[in-house]
Amino acid sequence: MNELLLHKGGEYCTLNDLREVPLPPETRTYRPVSHYDLAKNLAEVSGGLLRGYEMQGTQYGMARDGAQMFGVHTYKNGISGSMGLSVGFRNSYDKSMSVGIAIGASVFVCDNLALTGDIAIMRKHTQNVWNDLEELIITTIYRSQHNFTKIVEDAEEMRGRYLGNDDAFRLLGLLYGNDVISPRQIPVVKKEWLSPSYDDFSSRSVWSFYNACTEALKTAPPNKIMERHIALHNILEVRDD
């Protein structure tokens, strides 16, 4: 399984590692959300609401000595043999980002993540934080199957769209200009486009380019992972090159 966080200071971790990170102190106006409890509760609620889906795997990553966390739960069903429904989530102990949940898909062959729609964000960490979080989780999971179906349809459409090298490099410039791909990630996209690590992406299609980009986005910091994946999807799904 590929690591989610390979940028400087980021590291792959386990669920038990999340539990070992000390919680910051609670104040009158701020109640922290445990990385471990968020991951565990999200898996339990998803397992109860996603009927017909089976847990395929989980990935967790931390940065800033555990102050930032990003995770993905992936579920498999009969809709797609190559992709699974993914629930991405993030949290921080240093107030650098709020609890956020996004729905998408994971490509089984490479663990590349595709996200679409909006990020459900819990903006306040008050004394009722867990009631608010449970409502956020349930609402997001109820929308998840619709989002997953859309991503599967988008992926199929992208597979059918030919993309030559010149157009691919123009798109790469567009993604860089829109702060989706960083300067350090550009060589990764170029390498994965010209010489893919996986045979599944050897065809010259928008889908292959998409996965070259998501391979590079594995090095994005936790507070940018969701936004950059969603921006990538929004840019590539509407283009007709």
What function would you assign to each model-found segment?
Residues 67-74, 86:
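Short acidic loop-to-beta-strand element that houses the catalytic metal-binding Asp/Glu
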Residues 28, 43, 74-80:
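Charge-dense, intrinsically disordered terminal/linker segments
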